[in-house]
């Protein structure tokens, strides 16, 4: 049996973690000769991994010492490292074990000549393969032209059955008009979300929810008070299974400054929810019709949301198209086949 370590730098559940768990589950089901171990710092992610039946090896932090300890324990045939930190540490921890670097977002420093881009660029010499969730990951990487032979756009695994089962089994099924689902960080631009809600509140009553945690939580809490949104926006923090709330709500609002793929948009479509989002990263490959709206400015967001929330016929049509679009991007079997090809060295 071939052991593959999925290495991540975070201890909570969000986009990259979702992808890693989906890959592990799919590979276990379709290619049972693999032993797949999820390796990350311990924390809230443990509960999610237990519920998904994913083998977990907790580490103190991402470091060469800890990665080498885990390698010695499991003797892996391959390390599948998710995002930049895990990839770089893996590259400099072992010369013996092949590493696949899987990049889930196109952070702004990718475009610049800086210490981060140089360190990651040098680390790519060690990778067996570099996977990106959208073309923008490689198009915007300042050293992207040097890794063309080993880079491949793979998108994200979309498992409609798993998404819908998660929504059905969720304990929390409270419904809201508008949902923010993601980390509270610069990439997801949560302050813009609040500005949009404040403007929309001037036109109609509504209830919004923010699901997720992160380094901007204090700023978000302060902004909610500043804009007088205490009775309008509920800040839930990390929720281990947010799909029940998403399924019971009306619209997903994504205000991201940058994205890799935008997996939560696909999850919303799977649950029949229209998406209003910024046209960044892979989002335009997911939302390309009446199932959602792509806009960039606060007034445009407000107009699109007001239209969906007040026009029942328009909302129902967008919901129908969301389900239809989700069926087209359901790709779990095809995705697992690609991963198996990479693991097998083909």
Sequence positions of predicted segments:
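N-terminal strand-loop element at the rim of the active site
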Residues: 6-62
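Conserved acidic donor-binding segment of nucleotide-sugar-dependent glycosyltransferases
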Residues: 289-299, 307-312
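A charged, aromatic-enriched C-terminal amphipathic alpha-helix characteristic of glycosyltransferases
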Residues: 15, 313-344
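Carbohydrate-associated surface elements
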Residues: 136, 157
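Short hydrophobic beta-strand element within catalytic cores of glycosyltransferases
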Residues: 38, 274-277
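A conserved mid-protein helix/loop that constitutes part of the nucleotide-sugar donor-binding site
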Residues: 14-25, 180-204, 210, 215-221, ...
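Short His-centered aromatic/hydrophobic patch
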Residues: 81-87, 103
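Aromatic "clamp/platform" in nucleotide-sugar-dependent glycosyltransferases that forms part
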Residues: 238, 257
């Amino acid at each position: 049996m071939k052991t593959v370590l999925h290495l991540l730098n975070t201890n909570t559940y969000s986009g990259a973690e979702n992808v890693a768990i989906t890959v592990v589950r799919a590979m276990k089901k379709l290619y049972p000769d693999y032993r797949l171990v999820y390796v990350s710092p311990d924390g809230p992610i443990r509960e999610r991994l237990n519920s998904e039946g994913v083998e977990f090896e907790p580490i103190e932090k991402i470091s060469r010492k800890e990665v080498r300890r885990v390698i010695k324990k499991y003797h892996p045939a391959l390390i599948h490292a998710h995002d930049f930190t895990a990839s770089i540490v893996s590259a400099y921890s072992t010369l013996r074990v092949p590493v696949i670097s899987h990049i889930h977002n196109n952070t702004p420093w990718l475009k610049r000549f800086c210490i981060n881009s140089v360190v990651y660029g040098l680390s790519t010499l060690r990778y067996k393969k570099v996977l990106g969730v959208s073309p923008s990951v490689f198009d915007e990487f300042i050293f992207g032209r040097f890794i063309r032979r080993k880079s491949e756009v793979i998108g994200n695994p979309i498992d409609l059955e798993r998404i819908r089962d998660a929504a059905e089994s969720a304990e929390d099924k409270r419904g809201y008009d508008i949902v923010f689902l993601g980390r509270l960080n610069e990439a997801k631009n949560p302050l813009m979300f609040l500005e949009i809600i404040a403007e929309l509140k001037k036109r109609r009553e509504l209830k919004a929810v923010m699901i997720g945690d992160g380094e901007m939580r204090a700023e978000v809490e302060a902004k909610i008070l500043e804009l007088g949104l205490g009775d309008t926006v509920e800040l839930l923090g990390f929720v281990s299974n947010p799909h029940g709330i998403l399924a019971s709500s009306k619209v997903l609002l994504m205000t991201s400054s940058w994205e890799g793929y935008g997996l939560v948009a696909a999850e919303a479509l799977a649950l029949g929810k229209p998406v209003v989002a910024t046209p960044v990263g892979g989002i335009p490959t997911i939302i390309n019709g009446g199932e959602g709206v792509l806009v960039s400015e606060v007034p445009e967001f407000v107009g699109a949301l007001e239209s969906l929330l007040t026009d029942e016929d328009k909302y129902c049509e967008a919901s129908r198209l969301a389900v239809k679009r989700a069926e087209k991007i359901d790709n779990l079997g095809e995705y697992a086949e690609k991963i198996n090809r990479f693991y097998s060295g083909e």
